[in-house]
Amino acid sequence: MAAAVLTMTAFQGGQAQAAAKGAKKPKAAPAAPAPAAADGKRIFTTTCAACHQASGEGLGEQYPPLVGSEWVSDDEAKMVRIILHGLTGPVDVAGQTFSGAMPAWGAILKDQDIAAVATYVRGAWGNKSAPVSAASVKTIRSATLARTTPWTVAEQALVKK
């Protein structure tokens, strides 16, 4: 009978913990899930689709497609740097040159928002690139914090992965 009696042994964080002989320790909370696809799609729709279109196919000669783009499937850091700080000057995508400038979103979007939209784009419309984590965005943001101007294609080529 004594083994069945629970005793209050500690109060942590305002919650009582009961201990009993043979009781198992509680499991750690599971890790936070990757950014939800719905969040990425919502952010894309409100911040990116006006130029890149809901279909990801871009617009005319100004805004490049994201469908099958090497800028999407390449190193995730390149895409994150562009979302954070923008891109200016001509850019070649799928053999076509585009002249529109990409605005910087780093001052507006949080790390988890950038991770969500990058993950969405990297997995939408037949793209099959790995998800981007908020931790990765945070690292890239910290490494480029002093940057105040949009990237150019030439500068992106010089940045090591």
Model regions and ranges:
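Electrostatic cytochrome c docking/interface patches
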Residues: 14, 18-43, 59-62
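Sequence/structural segment immediately N-terminal to covalent heme-attachment motifs in c-type
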Residues: 33-59, 72-85
